[in-house]
Regions:
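Hydrophobic alpha-helical segments
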Residues: 1-112
Length: 112
């Protein structure tokens, strides 16, 4: 959701945790191009679609968006967890952007 600070830190950590440079590059390219289907499928892809819509067009969310997650095997607890994580990051990213926080002088990522 267009937060350079969060993207820099969290992507570096995610790439490390993926543990495969080629796969990490494929995932990053797919996400930056807004084409998660190029790197994900099934429930993971459906969660990413849900996250994207909740981030970009929250007013357009419908019960069908939740049902789509159920159709891919997520239970209500898992759906709530996805919802809370997306909502939290949207909130925090808006705080960071609103305060003008940058990575200048920071060590990017947790892992060495």
């Amino acid at each position: 959701n267009d937060c350079p600070y969060s993207l820099a830190n969290h992507w570096k950590n995610a790439a490390h945790l993926i543990g495969d440079t080629e796969k990490a590059t494929k995932v990053e390219q797919a996400l930056r191009a807004h084409r998660p289907e190029d790197a994900f499928q099934g429930a993971e892809l459906e969660m990413l679609k849900y996250a994207y819509k909740l981030t970009i067009k929250p007013g357009d969310m419908q019960q069908q968006d939740v049902q789509n997650l159920r159709d891919f095997g997520l239970d209500d607890g898992q759906i709530l967890e996805v919802n809370q994580i997306v909502g939290y990051f949207n909130y925090v990213n808006r705080l960071l952007n609103g305060l003008g926080v940058t990575t200048s002088g920071d060590t990017i990522g947790f892992y060495k």
